[in-house]
């Protein structure tokens, strides 16, 4: 269950870091936005390594579903944009895929 905490914290810091770059490069804000961006993205990478997984690629793929949930949450809470029905359908499809990756059977590759 601790994996979910790491996934959600990683998503928060990844989105915050990318949003800070967005504010600088797309919204014309000060280059000082790069400082919290780099700190946030570093924390994102460190937190994602805390996930208990044998293979990095599988951890990243499962994380993708959490990232998408968090991104739609960010859209609603931080940017104050109401998600569309198509957003929620996309979230559901991605979460189903991430769940299959996260909880699917593991067979030997030999």
UniProtKB/Swiss-Prot annotation:
InterPro entries: UPF0060 (IPR003844). It comes from the Bacteria. PANTHER family: UPF0060 MEMBRANE PROTEIN YNFA. Belongs to the UPF0060 family. GO terms for cellular component: plasma membrane. It is found in: Cell inner membrane. NCBIfam families: PRK02237.1 (NF002586). Keywords: Cell inner membrane, Cell membrane, Membrane, Transmembrane, Transmembrane helix. This is UPF0060 membrane protein Pfl01_4105. It is a multi-pass membrane protein. It comes from Pseudomonas fluorescens (strain Pf0-1). The chain crosses the membrane at residues 5-25, 28-48, 59-79, 84-104. The keyword Cell inner membrane applies.
């Amino acid at each position: 269950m601790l994996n979910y905490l790491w996934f959600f914290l990683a998503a928060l810091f990844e989105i915050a870091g990318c949003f800070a770059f967005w504010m600088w490069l797309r919204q014309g804000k000060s280059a000082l936005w790069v400082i919290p961006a780099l700190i946030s993205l570093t924390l994102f990478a460190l937190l994602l390594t805390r996930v208990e997984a044998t293979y990095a690629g599988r951890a990243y793929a499962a994380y993708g579903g959490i990232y998408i949930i968090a991104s739609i949450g960010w859209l609603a809470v931080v940017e104050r944009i109401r998600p569309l029905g198509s957003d929620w359908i996309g979230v559901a499809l991605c979460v189903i895929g991430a769940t299959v990756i996260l909880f699917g059977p593991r067979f030997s590759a030999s």
